[in-house]
Regions:
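Intrinsically disordered, low-complexity regulatory segments
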Residues: 1-144, 148
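Single conserved hydrophobic/aromatic residue that forms the stacking wall/gate
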Residues: 147, 152-156
Length: 156
């Protein structure tokens, strides 16, 4: 059996019907963490290291995913097929690794589909891939640039 994570609860409900009882489909409800709100969340002097914090409103979603993974041996990240979706998958994987929610034997896959139809979802499940790190890096560059420059822009 596998745990599938999508972004929205409505998608989770529909996709669960398509995949059946061999899958547990849960929603992240968007991003699960963001840059810390304090100064220094991005450190240019330390290779632009970023300090992330989990969104307090997403704790129950993360707990549900962690709990589901305790009984399963596969994680399928099925967030949206864009830069933000790729970033959400990356954030989820990082959080789950830090919480030690993934066993050494847990397979992690990334799937994408452009429509919430049975055919699209089932076809995507046949074509898993890894997280697209260039997309994640584009997201990280945008987030760090915004964090570092927004206070300056607001002062002008």
């Amino acid at each position: 059996m596998a745990v599938v994570v999508v972004e929205s609860p409505a998608k989770a409900k529909t996709i669960n019907k398509y995949l059946g009882s061999d899958f547990v489909v849960l929603a992240s409800v968007g991003h699960v963490r963001d840059l810390a709100s304090k100064n220094g969340a991005v450190d240019p002097a330390n290779d632009f290291e970023m300090n992330w914090e989990i969104d307090s409103n997403k704790q129950k979603n993360i707990k549900a995913i962690v709990d589901a993974l305790s009984n399963e041996n596969k994680l399928i990240l099925a967030t949206d097929p864009d830069r933000e979706g790729e970033a959400i998958s990356w954030h989820l994987l990082e959080v789950l690794q830090k919480k030690r929610a993934l066993k050494k034997s847990t397979a992690v896959e990334r799937v994408v589909f452009n429509a919430i139809t049975k055919n699209s979802v089932l076809e995507a499940m046949k074509n898993p891939r890894e997280i697209n790190m260039p997309l994640v890096e584009a997201y990280l560059a945008t987030v760090s640039y915004t964090h570092l420059t927004l206070p300056t822009i607001l002062l002008v």
